Regions:
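Conserved N-terminal beta1-alpha1 strand-loop-helix module at the mouth
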Residues: 1-69, 76-78, 82-85, 92-94, ...
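Glycine-rich, proline-tolerant flexible connector loops at the mouths of alpha/beta enzymes
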Residues: 38-59, 103-116, 164-176
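Catalytic cores of alpha/beta
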Residues: 79-93, 145-155, 198, 202-217
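N-terminal small/glycine-rich loop or linker at the start of catalytic domains
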Residues: 1-17, 109-113, 124-133
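Alpha-helix-loop-beta-strand connector modules within alpha/beta enzyme cores
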Residues: 49-74, 117-139, 175-200, 204
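Active-site beta-loop-alpha junctions enriched in small/polar residues
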Residues: 7-13, 45-47, 73-79, 102-106, ...
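Histidine/lysine/aspartate-rich catalytic loop segments that bind and position anionic ligands
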Residues: 137-192
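Hydrophobic faces of well-ordered beta-strands that scaffold small-molecule active sites
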Residues: 2-8, 40-42, 68-74, 97-101, ...
Length: 219
């Protein structure tokens, strides 16, 4: 069964725009889980535009109490900046169920491309080793590229998360070539025994098509 992990960044963005703690991340995390989600996802960024470091312990506690997964996304190379302690320091403090590594820069609006694992192999390997030593499942954000899947297998990642922004656009335009690229990538990942997550712009209209391409563990 494909599991659903809900990203609560936008709830945090609204909260921060209003100041105070309304809407409450804790309240809505519980509501999301009670509604059937299998996990909560956050992506803390150095500019603290939405998720803040002090949110993480409360969300972690809720996910443990309600027996669902906690997935923290981010760039492992982001270092301490003001009140942001650095990404790996956050991971070390919280030790989530899953850590999804994304290649965003600090000023990026949203995740919009995957890693070049070939060029980042050695640095990513060090991070993946740390995650494994701490019993944190690793996931690496990639584009639907067979070469990157081979590199992901070689570097030792537990899962890959396929960036599905272009898939969603191709679905709207009925772009069969792009859709076929995603199908091929998911089938190949299944063949080489890399577990697959997928994320970005998925909705009730396009999700069934994506899930028909193969075994996807989480969206």
């Amino acid at each position: 069964m494909t599991k659903l992990s809900v990203n609560i960044n936008k709830i945090a963005l609204i909260r921060n725009s209003r100041k105070g703690n309304n809407p409450s991340l804790e309240f809505f995390s519980k509501k999301i889980i009670e509604s059937g989600a299998h996990g909560i996802t956050v992506h803390p960024r150095p500019d603290l535009r939405h998720i803040r470091p002090d949110d993480l312990s409360d969300i972690s506690l809720i996910t443990k109490e309600l027996d669902v997964e906690f997935n923290i996304e981010g760039n492992p190379y982001e270092e301490r900046l003001g009140d942001y302690p650095g990404f790996l320091n956050l991971i070390d403090a919280v030790k989530p169920s899953q850590c999804t590594l994304v290649p965003d820069d600090s000023n990026q609006l949203t995740s919009d491309h995957g890693w070049n694992i070939h060029s980042e192999h050695n640095k990513l390997k060090d991070v993946l080793t740390y995650l494994k030593q701490n019993n944190i499942r690793s996931s690496v954000f990639i584009d639907p590229d067979i070469s990157q899947l081979d590199a992901a297998k070689d570097v030792g990642v537990d899962r890959i998360e396929i960036y599905t922004g272009p898939f969603a656009e191709a679905f709207e335009k009925n772009d069969e070539n792009t859709l076929a690229t995603y199908k091929e990538a998911i089938e190949y990942a299944n063949e080489i025994n890399i577990e697959v997550n997928a994320g970005h712009d998925l909705n009730l209209e396009n999700l069934a098509t994506l899930l028909s391409y193969g075994d996807i563990k989480e969206v």
